[in-house]
């Protein structure tokens, strides 16, 4: 990481009734921080929130992270299934300017390689202003698989993770230029969008 790279502000939101009330320790935010710290070359400012499965509170938190905290990227974890209190996608779509359905489609494709119940996930991606918001699974292993994708024994991608598309999406909505460690995840951009290395 160097001072020539753009600062990235990332909101991490864990949505869980039990973790937010202290019944058990949240694992989502630490898993996200660990993965992002390994994957990103940019300096990162994290804004973290641990909240219950309450749609108005999720909406307010997402709005605050996008509009007040100035996050370029917001990642949520938890609350994406079909149960009555799984309302993270509903809150996410409610605050969106535009829905990006390809993110949810790819997340389900990745998870279907492991469990047939992946089709029950309602994960999605949206844009609010200049912020990309993505709903991720709640389990650390699933978070890593979703972001990074699935690789064969030689390290070649079998299924691309969603994060490969995140830097270019953020470019297109006016955010900072994100650089990744290719050994973790290789960001994809068209050649015309690749920034020349700084001297």
Predicted regions and their residues:
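Non-catalytic beta/alpha edge segments that cap or flank active sites
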Residues: 1-199
